[in-house]
Amino acid sequence: MMDSVLEEDVTLLGTLSGCSGLVPNVPDDLDGINPDARLGNGVLSNVSEETVSPTRARNMKDFENQITELKKENFNLKLRIYFLEERMQQEFHGPAEHIYKTNIELKVEVESLKRELQERERLLIRASKAVESLAEAGGSEIQRVKEDARKKVQQVEDLLTKRILLLEKDVKAAQAELEKAFAGTETEKALRLSLESKLSEMKKMHKGDLAMALVLDEKDRLIEELKLSLKSKEALIQCLKEEKSQMASPDENVSSGELRGLCAAPREEKERETEAAQMEHQKERNSFEERIQALEEDLREKEREIATEKKNSLKRDKAIQGLTMALKSKEKKVEELNSEIEKLSAAFAKAREALQKAQTQEFQGSENYEAALSGKEALLTELRSQNLTKSAENHRLRRSIKKITQELSDLQQERERLEKDLEEAHREKSRGDCTIRDLRNEVEKLRNEVNERKKAMENRYKNLLSESSKKLHNQEQVIKHLTERTNHKDMLLQKFNEKDLEVIQQNHYLMTAEDLELRSEGLITEKCPSQQSPGSKTIFSKEEKQSSDYQELIQVLKKEQDIYTHLVKSLQESDSINNLQAELNNIFALRKQLERDVLSYQNLRRTLEEQISEIRRREEESFSFYSDQTSYLSICLEENNRFQVEHFSQEELKKKVSDLIQLVKELYTDDQHLKKTIFDLSCMGFQGNGFPDRLVSTEQTEIMKDLSKGGCKNGYLRHTEPKILESDGAHTPGCLEEGVFINLLAPLFNEKATLLLESRPDLLKVVRELLLGHLCLAEQDVSGEHLGGKTEKTPKLHKKLFEQEKKLQNTMKLLQLSKRQEKVIFDQLVVTHKILRKARGNLELRPGGAHPGTCSPSRPGS
């Protein structure tokens, strides 16, 4: 059964996917069967893909390999079917009608699939052939046209070379014949010379009759030979003339035919090329037609030159004909001369007879003999003259022949030059075609690149604009939110300032003279550092960060708005890509400059902050040291000077107390004046700048805690401390430089710094100038609207910062100089404090001895 299946179905291809119920019972380890044989329809899927895409470039080898693989798989499937049938027969001994039906159906499916496969293979073969024919058609046609043109050009070149060789051979043969003719003429000259010599000898030998007879016989023989040679030369001349006439006529015909062929061949080739170019390249038609017209004009000019050369050749032929006519006339003359020679020969015969008669009649008459000799001499002279004329004519003929040969060589050279010009024109045409194709390809590539770049640039700008619009929208929302918050905080600050002013006015009315003493005591003994709590510091730092971030966001927004407005304007104006690139380069350069300026500004700010922090640290250390020293000195004075004060009299004590009261009043007035000025400056510098609600609440709580602790016995100082704190901790959210500058001036707003400033009005002026200059700088920074203006103001700001640094250094020097004065003031205050205490003790011991300058102790409620 297996043999029958193999013989019937050689290229069977089938799938058993339809009868999946039979597959699980099949063993995988059968003999002679590949376990990797697939029962799915993977092969058919590959075939279907190939039928779907018939234009795929595939060779016949690929198809043959695929067919062999299909045959192998078909064979494996047949074996598997055979073993399946045997296994089914072994397992099922009962009725097998269902199995037979399935087998028949499978065979039917296999045959149908086989037919489909054959049809698809045919389609694939046809498609591959069609693709190959289409791919090779264009190249084959171009190659065929090129080969035809090359063959025609080679044929024309071969014909021209053959004709040229034939002409050269003919010219060489004619030259050889002419040389032979010239050699014959030379021999004739030699013979004539020999005849003349012989005639001269005959004159000498007229003594002997026998010798004369022999000489006459020889002369007759020579004359006959000369006649024969003349006849042969005349025959040669006629043959040469006939050959020349024959050569001239076919040469003219050949040259005209060749020229016509040469003219017709390139015209036909050009017509074919123009037709092909019209079909393939319609746009190139104008350029090719212009070039063809130029070539046709060149060909016409060359045809005109050839026509002129033909006319010249005709003229030359006419000249040759004229020369032939002259030769004929000369031949006639030669015939006449021959007739004369015959007459002379007859005369010679008569002379012989006369000589014979003279021999017989030797002695009859010498006079007749001499007359005969004179007649012969006359004949010889005539023959000599005729020979000379013939030799001159021969020279003229040679010269004319040389001229004709030169003209023929010139014509051949001109013909070669024209052929070379034609070849060069063909080469230039081919080169021009190649260059035009290359240029077109380059132009197409450039257009594609330009279009791609334009698309990329448009997409990029669109993306940038969309992103920028989104960013602007988000940032505008943030700005609105922040402005609302700042307005709310400004309102709260204004309320807080109004409350502070009311409290200050109330405290002014509650002050009494008792508070003066307690205030002086508080100034000397107590240390009121007016330090802020860590919570307030953190809140201030957060607010500073928020304000700095807010300002940076505003600056970035302004920069981006300027950049994007400029970009939108440039895009709306629809300038060229070069302008856009130049603007982008300028923007990048400005950004780099801004980044450099920002870095330099940050470095300067860091250096200033470091210097300011060092100065603050030193000042705080110095103030703390001075306070410790004053407290220590006060203790020492209390212990050591107790006995010295007891020795004072009542009048001295009264004077010292009155002086101290006046000094304290002056200090108090100066202190109030200084605090008012500082408060005014703080209000001027920080008016309109909001604080957060948390900061206000924390400040209020801290102030209440300080009041509850009772750090200072002076009520005025209790109410003024929040203002000092306010002036210390107030930072404008406009810029970070103001915060740094106010942190630098914070130590000056402490109580100990106020005492120093009271004693030094020049320091007050310097502080005022610094504050006013810093405020002007802040206003100038805020007033900058666009990026270009800020870039121009950066060097000015650097200069102003440098000037402020110098001023700060000067103030630090002044502060260092004022340390000594502080020591003196503190010593004086300690001394006055001790004196006041002793005086108070002495007065209290006396009954009813109250001094008018003294006051009752302070109330706890104040």
Swiss-Prot record:
GO cellular component terms listed in the entry, alphabetical order: centrosome; cytoplasm; Golgi apparatus; microtubule; microtubule plus-end; mitotic spindle pole; pericentriolar material; perinuclear region of cytoplasm
Sites bearing Phosphoserine, chain numbering: 547, 862
This protein's name: CDK5 regulatory subunit-associated protein 2
Protein source organism: Macaca fascicularis
UniProt-listed InterPro entries: CC_CDK5RAP2_MYOME (IPR056273), CDK5RAP2 (IPR042791), Cnn_1N (IPR012943)
Post-translational modification: Phosphorylated in vitro by CDK5.
Major localization class: cytoplasm
Subcellular location as annotated: Cytoplasm, Cytoskeleton, Microtubule organizing center, Centrosome; Golgi apparatus; Cytoplasm; Cytoplasm, Cytoskeleton
Gene Ontology terms, MF aspect: calmodulin binding; gamma-tubulin binding; microtubule binding; protein kinase binding; transcription cis-regulatory region binding
Disulfide bridges in this chain: none
GO BP terms, alphabetized: brain development; centriole replication; centrosome cycle; chromosome segregation; establishment of mitotic spindle orientation; microtubule bundle formation; microtubule cytoskeleton organization; microtubule organizing center organization
Annotated segments matching region Required for centrosomal attachment, Golgi localization and CALM1 interaction: 830-839
UniProt region (Interaction with NCKAP5L), positions on chain: 58-196
The entry's keywords: Calmodulin-binding, Cytoplasm, Cytoskeleton, Golgi apparatus, Microtubule, Phosphoprotein
Subunit structure: Homodimer. Interacts with CDK5R1 (p35 form). CDK5RAP1, CDK5RAP2 and CDK5RAP3 show competitive binding to CDK5R1. May form a complex with CDK5R1 and CDK5. Interacts with pericentrin/PCNT; the interaction is leading to centrosomal and Golgi localization of CDK5RAP2 and PCNT. Interacts with AKAP9; the interaction targets CDK5RAP2 and AKAP9 to Golgi apparatus. Interacts with MAPRE1; the interaction is direct and targets CDK5RAP2 and EB1/MAPRE1 to microtubule plus ends. Interacts with TUBG1; the interaction is leading to the centrosomal localization of CDK5RAP2 and TUBG1. Interacts with TUBGCP3.
Function: Potential regulator of CDK5 activity via its interaction with CDK5R1. Negative regulator of centriole disengagement (licensing) which maintains centriole engagement and cohesion. Involved in regulation of mitotic spindle orientation. Plays a role in the spindle checkpoint activation by acting as a transcriptional regulator of both BUBR1 and MAD2 promoter. Together with EB1/MAPRE1, may promote microtubule polymerization, bundle formation, growth and dynamics at the plus ends. Regulates centrosomal maturation by recruitment of the gamma-tubulin ring complex (gTuRC) onto centrosomes.
Top-level taxon of origin: Eukaryota
Residue ranges, annotated region (CM1 motif): 51-94
